[in-house]
């Protein structure tokens, strides 16, 4: 499982998804809600959550795509119960904090941080300028 805003899909996202795909038989992608994205990034995405959901759904590498839950970002993890959670290199969640929260919730998932792919070129905040 991996998650993100996926506002303007670019090669960095594709790298993240393809690397995450290597860690399981099925790739489930959680697309952040508009309000969640605003909370974490300080602004609304260019594309709304339904548009971003559909864009990710069109990617052949993705087996399933869902919208995140409103409120607590961990609630969707309890629903999906993944074996592996892949974090992007620039996602602010600390691996150790995530592992502790998963343990509290009884979710047994390995947490992996995916390396960056040319972040000087492919980072959504840079592409939007």
Label for each model-derived stretch:
Residues 1-129:
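Nucleotidyltransferase catalytic core that binds NTPs
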């Amino acid at each position: 499982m991996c998650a993100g805003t996926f506002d303007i899909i670019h090669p960095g996202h594709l790298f993240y998804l393809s690397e995450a795909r290597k860690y399981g038989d099925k790739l489930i992608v959680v697309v952040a809600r508009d309000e969640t994205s605003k909370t974490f990034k300080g602004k609304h995405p260019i594309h709304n959550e339904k548009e971003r959901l559909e864009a990710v759904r069109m990617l052949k590498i993705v087996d399933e795509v869902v919208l995140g839950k409103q409120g607590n970002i961990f609630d969707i993890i309890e629903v999906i119960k993944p074996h592996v959670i892949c974090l992007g290199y620039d996602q602010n969640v600390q691996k150790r904090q995530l592992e502790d929260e998963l343990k509290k919730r009884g979710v047994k998932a390995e947490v992996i941080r995916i390396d960056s792919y040319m972040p000087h070129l492919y980072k959504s905040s840079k592409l939007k300028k």
